[in-house]
Design a protein with these regions (language model features):
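Flexible glycan-contacting loops in extracellular carbohydrate-active proteins
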Residues: 133-158
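Extracellular beta-strand elements of beta-rich domains used
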Residues: 114, 157-161
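Carbohydrate-binding surfaces in secreted/extracellular proteins
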Residues: 52, 106-134
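Secretory/extracellular carbohydrate-interaction modules
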Residues: 29-95
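Short, aromatic/His-centered strand-loop micro-motif at the edge of beta-sheets
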Residues: 91-113
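Short, small-residue-biased leader/transition segments that mark boundaries at the very start
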Residues: 1-6
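Generic beta-strand structural signal
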Residues: 21, 79-81, 116-118
Length: 162
């Protein structure tokens, strides 16, 4: 299986308030109000995993996104400031597909992986499966990968797709 490690910000669509180069992390994105995303990929990306070691700075929620088909269509594996970990589907409006309790702390690194395989969506923490769901209601079948931040800042050194 091929793995691609992305560290070059020029390969990304940016729909975010701030993505500055003055920080040590190549990916340090801030969305002041609402949800902002950065992503790469195309409609040939179907079944894959996206992984990253993410650090969250005072966000309402944030995490990884997969099968991105624009700003309003994607799956997300997110942590929230309300101590939840969830798999969500953005299909013009945000739908929480599954949510579990999660002991979340700001300014802490989390190794997350979001895996999409047909209608099955799985979330991993430190390579351990911790949440999964099947989307049977108009599933997203293809699209790019990236990260999402809601009302705050998240950062990472790289995003891996395999």
């Amino acid at each position: 299986q091929r793995q691609m490690c992305i560290r070059d910000r020029n390969n990304f669509v940016q729909a975010i308030d701030k993505w500055e180069t003055r920080w040590k992390e190549p990916f340090r994105i801030t969305q002041n109000i609402g949800r902002g995303v950065v992503f790469t990929g195309n409609d040939k990306w179907k079944n894959y995993s996206v992984s990253s070691k993410l650090n969250f700075h005072l966000v309402k929620s944030g995490g990884l996104i997969a099968r991105v088909q624009g700003l309003k269509r994607y799956y997300a594996l997110e942590v929230t400031a309300q101590n939840k970990l969830r798999i969500a589907k953005m299909y013009y409006d945000l739908e929480i597909l599954k949510e579990i309790d999660f002991d979340f702390e700001f300014f802490t690194d989390y190794n997350l992986t979001l895996q999409v395989n047909n209608g099955h969506i799985k979330g991993y923490l430190d390579d351990k499966l911790i949440i999964e769901v099947e989307d049977k209601n108009n599933p997203l079948d293809f699209g790019g990968a990236g990260i999402v931040a809601e009302d705050g800042t998240i950062c990472t050194d790289q995003i891996s797709v395999s």
